[in-house]
Amino acid sequence: MSNPMRTPMVEKVIVHMGVGESGQHLVNAEEILKTITGQEVVRCFAKRTLPAFSIKKNEPIGCKVTLRGQRAQEFLGTSFEIIEKTLSRAQFDSLGNVSFGIEEHTDFPGMRYDPNIGVFGMDVTVVLKRPGERICKRRIATRKIPTDHRVTVDDAIAFLNESYGVEVM
């Protein structure tokens, strides 16, 4: 695009592992996520009690990391290589964000299978934005983002194809 204010960019990448239980299994997932991303991990807690899964309210059941800037770019490059640079159009939401899953953490470079730890999968969510989105986040003179300035699905697909060579089926 010729106008730099219309060019989409990556705001953040969220990597999430839903383990479903606390204890050593969750600690192993946190260590794997910290190794893969090189960043501190935050725990996710259950919102309500689910007796069928023996989950109590406020029990830690997952972990996540939010990546921004250069780390997000590097992680996305590796992640798209793992999923062979193919996405489905159904993986995009109406705001141009995209989510996809990685089935095994052992697909990442430098990660090997350890029978004591097991295999973990993860969810990756990419949030895209355009320059000028600060107007909806600032404290003074907050405004809505105009409809024509929001990132659409087609804009997101074009950006990912151009920047990372991702094909959308």
Swiss-Prot record:
| InterPro entries per record | Ribosomal_uL5, Ribosomal_uL5_arc, Ribosomal_uL5_C, Ribosomal_uL5_CS, Ribosomal_uL5_dom_sf, Ribosomal_uL5_N
Keywords from UniProt, A to Z, are: Ribonucleoprotein, Ribosomal protein, RNA-binding, rRNA-binding, tRNA-binding
Q: Name one Pfam family in it.
A: Ribosomal_L5_C
- Is-annotated flag, keyword tRNA-binding? yes
- GO terms of biological process kind: translation
**Sample GO molecular function, one term:** structural constituent of ribosome
One GO cellular-component annotation of the UniProt record comes to: ribonucleoprotein complex
Question: Which superkingdom, per the lineage?
Answer: Archaea
Per the record's keyword annotation, is Nucleotide-binding included, yes or no? Answer: no
Family indicated by similarity: Belongs to the universal ribosomal protein uL5 family.
Q: Which NCBIfam families match?
A: PRK04219.1
Explain the purpose of this protein: This is one of the proteins that bind and probably mediate the attachment of the 5S RNA into the large ribosomal subunit, where it forms part of the central protuberance. In the 70S ribosome it contacts protein S13 of the 30S subunit (bridge B1b), connecting the 2 subunits; this bridge is implicated in subunit movement. May contact the P site tRNA; the 5S rRNA and some of its associated proteins might help stabilize positioning of ribosome-bound tRNAs.
Quaternary structure and partners: Part of the 50S ribosomal subunit; contacts the 5S rRNA and probably tRNA. Forms a bridge to the 30S subunit in the 70S ribosome.
Q: Which PANTHER family match?
A: 60S RIBOSOMAL PROTEIN L11-RELATED
Return the protein name. Large ribosomal subunit protein uL5
